[in-house]
């Protein structure tokens, strides 16, 4: 009997759509002269690919609307996290379709290509047949991870190492977090590649990161007499799992009253956080780890600012690579994040500004910078803003809240949780108001 993996023999729960069956095969009729069914197949597929990239309902609907206008079709769209329901009207006929994706994720490289496709549609694709357009969409749809699992593991290692410093950790915590996060995300990427379910991916990768951090700390204790107080950094080794994209896009969707998409994305992000923090808490109990405070680094204000700028750059760069951004796009997001996150931290330290207010200021700055840069290089705004502020998402606060809930220290748990919620609310608000100030199409209710 052949040795087949489960993914080779199991029946797919989401059947693939034969898109080319909806296009005329004679190759003589351009898409703008085609029938409503053929036009709807192109419009729906564009929306579905946009949705699979992780972008919000506003961007998905905008892209579908632009194609509809070019094709002489009226389109109404309802967008969720995993599915799209839309209706197309041409004055004579009406077609309703419900489309869904098998899994959700983030792919900023594919999103960039799709935005170029939509922008160029009036000049290029509108003069092609439906079959030719679907072939081009086939090519874009094949853009999967442009980095190997090893490189994505390295990106997570760099991001979490930088994150550790920004949260107050020292060199030892940074080194241990580098190793543990790198291996943890490598495992997570491998599991995703083999299509394992979400809960299993989170549980295994988080457990592995905690175990590796504790194991290497124990080795360092025995070999170099490193004190056990450095166990505080184990939290930082699992911050690669933070669902920054769905958290932020949910806020943007809610701001535009796309309640279905916003609430579904928020629920998805909460699921990831709850599963991750629960397994991290269980591992902490098994390994006897405690989320203690970091030791004071005793840095001068100027040196601290310089290091914050550097670490913010590398932290955002790492997260952006994990979102499948090309290196130039990741570097651009990293420059924005270095400025915005350092501003946030300095406002807290130098002015005593509450952390949520500083988070709003940092996110607003990131949004304004991204809008300015978008005008010059054409990168999708969300591909710059979300990576640049994901480093501000209070993963440490969320974990400490769940940890204290677990040990029934309810007063501390509520305090950490309230602080986290305030910051999580402030971050998308900053991006939303930056968008309102710089994008007139977003400013009005249409």
Question: Each predicted region: which residue ranges?
Answer:
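Core alpha-helical transmembrane segments of integral membrane proteins
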Residues: 146-249, 321-323, 327, 332
